[in-house]
Design a protein with these regions (language model features):
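Conserved glycine-rich Rossmann-like NAD(P)H-binding loop of the short-chain dehydrogenase/reductase
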Residues: 82-98
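Conserved mid-core segment of classical short-chain dehydrogenase/reductases
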Residues: 122, 126, 130, 145-165, ...
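Residue(s) in the substrate-gating loop at a strand-loop-helix junction
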Residues: 199
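Rossmann-fold scaffold of SDR-type NAD(P)-dependent oxidoreductases
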Residues: 65, 115, 137-150, 171, ...
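SDR active-site lid
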Residues: 221, 227-305
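Active-site helix of classical SDR
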Residues: 179, 215
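Conserved glycine-rich cofactor-binding loop
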Residues: 61, 68-69, 92
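Catalytic Tyr-X3-Lys loop
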Residues: 137, 146, 155-177, 187, ...
Length: 329
């Protein structure tokens, strides 16, 4: 091969690599800009343009499960502020009464309390059905749920067998049965909103939170599928995927990445009617978009390794804080 031919060949190879690099750069830039637009639109523009749900056109009552603390209580108060009467469903009657009085006094709406334990037998849904059957239901927030006390290996969870049964009942059965209770009412009215609280951990398998993240995947999949079944009937069913929120369950303090329940709900409600799946809080949206990209472009084994390493760090901090012996070193 002559020197001239070699130069041409090298030039062609360099040109191909340059164009491939440009193509990759343009594709990544497009994805970043699309995520930026998605976040900007769902956080700010949709609400300003009136593209969100018209809450005033829904039924008069909103049902919120797990409503005495955290995200559930914040949703109850936010919906009461919009004029909904509130059905508060949770385990402890005294706490329910306290929240009910607070809401009635602050927002001049009616409340109704139903004290049931979602980890018990399924006959609780007959009790709930009797309490809500005559109500004009506009909104259901499926917030009740339970998680690990700390990141842990599946077989080393304290009272693991009982916990696994309770976790499935609280996170999976409750969401399914409550949705099945209110959907016929909403279908008859031709309108309604169901908000199912899942988790950012539902985007990919999460080692050391394996059972919890698996239940939240169920909530996400159920929500997206049922939304598609009922969207033509005027019913909005949205999956809500929060990151870290400062609640009694998480035992985390507010920070840049850990928001208050009130802040989370404020942002999440701006996305109802705009997107089928929301991360709610702006920082959680950023985390969600990054995680989506990692899932799409990195091998699954690497994503699992990243998640495992992150949760292992959290687990070690907990063990150190409470002086526990870590046998998994």
């Amino acid at each position: 091969m002559s020197t001239v031919e070699k130069c041409i060949q090298n030039t062609d190879s360099a040109g191909i690599l340059w164009y491939l690099g440009l193509l990759v750069f343009c594709w990544i830039s497009f994805k970043l800009l699309r995520s930026l637009w998605r976040g900007l639109y769902t956080c700010i523009l949709a609400d300003l343009l009136g593209a969100t749900v018209d809450w005033k056109k829904l039924g008069k009552w909103a049902i919120v499960t797990g409503s005495t603390d955290g995200i559930g209580k914040a949703y109850a108060k936010a919906l009461a502020k919009k004029g909904f009467n509130i059905v508060l469903i949770s385990r402890t009657f005294e706490k329910l009464e306290t929240v009910a009085q607070e809401i009635e006094k602050s927002y001049s709406v009616k409340t109704k309390v139903v004290a049931v334990d979602f980890t018990k037998d399924v006959d609780i849904y007959d009790i709930i059905r009797r309490e809500i059957e005559d109500l004009d239901i506009g909104v259901l927030v499926n917030n009740i749920g339970m998680s690990y006390k700390y990141a842990e290996y599946l077989t080393k969870i304290v009272d693991g067998v009982q916990f696994s049964d309770d976790c499935v009942k609280a996170n999976i059965t409750s969401c399914t049965r409550m949705t099945m209770l209110v959907l016929p009412v909403m279908e008859k009215l031709g309108k309604g909103v169901i908000l199912n609280v899942s988790s950012l951990s539902a985007l990919s398998p999460m080692p050391l939170l394996s059972l919890y993240s698996a239940t939240k995947v169920y909530v996400k999949f159920l929500t997206e599928a049922v939304h598609d079944e009922y969207k033509s009937k005027g019913i909005i069913i949205q999956a809500v995927l929060p990151g870290f929120v400062s609640t009694n369950m998480s035992k985390m303090r507010p920070s840049f990445t850990t928001c208050t329940p009130e802040a989370f709900v404020k942002w999440a409600m701006k996305s109802v009617g705009v997107e089928m799946r929301t991360y709610g809080y702006p920082v959680h949206k950023l985390q969600g978009y990054i995680q989506e990209a990692l899932i799409q472009y990195l091998p699954e084994s690497l994503n699992l390794s990243i998640g495992h390493s992150m949760m292992q760090g959290i687990r070690k901090k907990y063990y150190k804080k409470f002086g526990l012996t870590d046998k998994e070193k």
